[in-house]
Amino acid sequence: MSLTETIEKKLIEAFHPERLEVINESHQHTGHQPGFDGTGESHMRVRIVSSAFAGMSRVARHRAINDLLKPELDAGLHALAVEPAAPGEPTRW
C-alpha cells in the first residue's frame, strides 16, 4: 500500500470525512534537499471536511491529524500540509 493510500485509509477510519483529498506534492520539492528527487512520497497535502472537527479549534484539528499520522511522519514523511474544515465552513479548495 502506498503512503497516499495509507494516509487516506487512516483518515477515513478516524474522521469519516464528507470530503477528502490526499495530494502528493513531492514533485514540487525536487532538489530541495539531497534525496528529494520528486518521485517519492515525501510531501503531502491533506484536505478534509469532517463533522469530527465541529467545535474544534484550528490548532486542535491539526494536532488530531498530526497525532494520527505520527508513525508516517516518524518513518520519513517530510512535510504534511493540512487543510481541515467542518461541514459548512468555507474552504479555499
Curated annotation (Swiss-Prot):
The regions listed as transmembrane in this protein's record are none
Q: Name one Pfam family in it.
A: BolA
SUPFAM superfamilies tied to this protein: BolA-like
Judging by the UniProt lineage, the source's domain of life is Bacteria
Q: Which InterPro entries match?
A: BolA, BolA-like_sf
GO BP annotations, alphabetical order: iron-sulfur cluster assembly
UniProt family annotation: Belongs to the BolA/IbaG family.
Task: Please give the name of this protein.
Answer: Uncharacterized protein in cobS 5'region
